[in-house]
Amino acid sequence: MGDTFIRHIALLGFEKRFVPSQHYVYMFLVKWQDLSEKVVYRRFTEIYEFHKTLKEMFPIEAGAINPENRIIPHLPAPKWFDGQRAAENRQGTLTEYCSTLMSLPTKISRCPHLLDFFKVRPDDLKLPTDNQTKKPETYLMPKDGKSTATDITGPIILQTYRAIANYEKTSGSEMALSTGDVVEVVEKSESGWWFCQMKAKRGWIPASFLEPLDSPDETEDPEPNYAGEPYVAIKAYTAVEGDEVSLLEGEAVEVIHKLLDGWWVIRKDDVTGYFPSMYLQKSGQDVSQAQRQIKRGAPPRRSSIRNAHSIHQRSRKRLSQDAYRRNSVRFLQQRRRQARPGPQSPGSPLEEERQTQRSKPQPAVPPRPSADLILNRCSESTKRKLASAV
């Protein structure tokens, strides 16, 4: 078994807690060497104490001997009173700090002090109980990772979803569900695996097992884009259902509809169908890195879930495979017509000249003059020839 180390640390946001007194904790998603992902909570005072100890352990890299040799990032000291504004404004600094830590030499980025600090503690597993008078308020980071004072104006109410069927977890990072369980969604990944919490549990759940409480439809699903986005398959997949597409690793496709359940509609030549999004990578990006980040299989599709039970009277609104195919074919035909030169479009300068000549009006043919007019206006020689002919 290899050495333990951290691959990546992402700041998810922060929580405003009221027990035992009001304070703020930051939420970090820590990805370990075995591709497991854990959420940990740390106060900024804890982070700053960790930072001070790290500088003492590596004085040269901290610039204590020569400031020019410093590679350990700076971290401002906490203030006497840190309010919500300070907690918000500090998120950008912490994001850069964690990113820099992971890029340091392994003797620092994999040292026991750093690994121990980001390991899951018993307190990280304690969630607020139902009998608490005031539950924590969750503030999530924007998608682009940049936080300003205007990005977060109030507590973000986590979206609530309901399980439509039982789900048995297949790894330690997942969470088991029973039909009717209500969960809060912390993160919606494009892979179709959502990070959720429920009472004293947290973990990844296939989005296909969840439905919104107020409607069967997912309001955040984008509209189809029949122009398509170029993607490359980073892992081979063989279709299981009739409306899916089989691809080999390295095949290029166009994505025409990105659905949140992790099954995107793709176009390969004139064929359309579903394909797991976690096996796709945008064209032109590093494929090897994306392949290393595949940590679990594709999530199951809702059509494959047995004994699914929805609380809604009507079913979800989904385009059929025929509708995708018709709309895609219609778009491709229109694009080909626009790209093909029209009958009035000249193909070369010579053709343009011929077209111009053909478009000019032809001169009118004058009427034949009468015999009297010819005799009156012709020369004497012509008159003698006409007279001899008669």
UniProtKB/Swiss-Prot annotation:
Name of the gene this protein is made from: NCF1
Impact when changing R90A: Reduces affinity for membranes enriched in phosphatidylinositol 3,4-bisphosphate
Organism whose genome encodes this protein: Homo sapiens (Human)
Membrane is among the record's keywords: yes
GO terms (BP aspect): cellular defense response; cellular response to glucose stimulus; cellular response to testosterone stimulus; epithelial cell proliferation; hydrogen peroxide biosynthetic process; inflammatory response; innate immune response; leukotriene metabolic process
Biological function: Subunit of the phagocyte NADPH oxidase complex that mediates the transfer of electrons from cytosolic NADPH to O2 to produce the superoxide anion (O2(-)). In the activated complex, electrons are first transferred from NADPH to flavin adenine dinucleotide (FAD) and subsequently transferred via two heme molecules to molecular oxygen, producing superoxide through an outer-sphere reaction.
Domain called SH3: residue spans: 156-215, 226-285
Protein name: Neutrophil cytosol factor 1
Pfam families listed in its UniProt record: NCF1_PBR_AIR (PF16621), p47_phox_C (PF08944), PX (PF00787), SH3_1 (PF00018)
InterPro entries: NADPH_Oxidase/PX-Domain, NCF1_C, NCF1_PBR/AIR, NCF1_SH3_1, NCF1_SH3_2, P47PHOX, PX_dom, PX_dom_sf
Subunit structure, interactors included: Component of the phagocyte NADPH oxidase complex composed of an obligatory core heterodimer formed by the membrane proteins CYBA and CYBB and the cytosolic regulatory subunits NCF1/p47-phox, NCF2/p67-phox, NCF4/p40-phox and the small GTPase RAC1 or RAC2. Part of a cytosolic complex composed at least by NCF1, NCF2 and NCF4. Interacts (via C-terminus) with NCF2 (via the C-terminal SH3 domain). Interacts with NCF4. Interacts with CYBB. Interacts (via the second SH3 domain) with CYBA; interaction is phosphorylation-dependent. Interacts with NOXA1. Interacts with ADAM15. Interacts with TRAF4.
Effect of R43Q: Reduces affinity for membranes enriched in phosphatidylinositol 3,4-bisphosphate
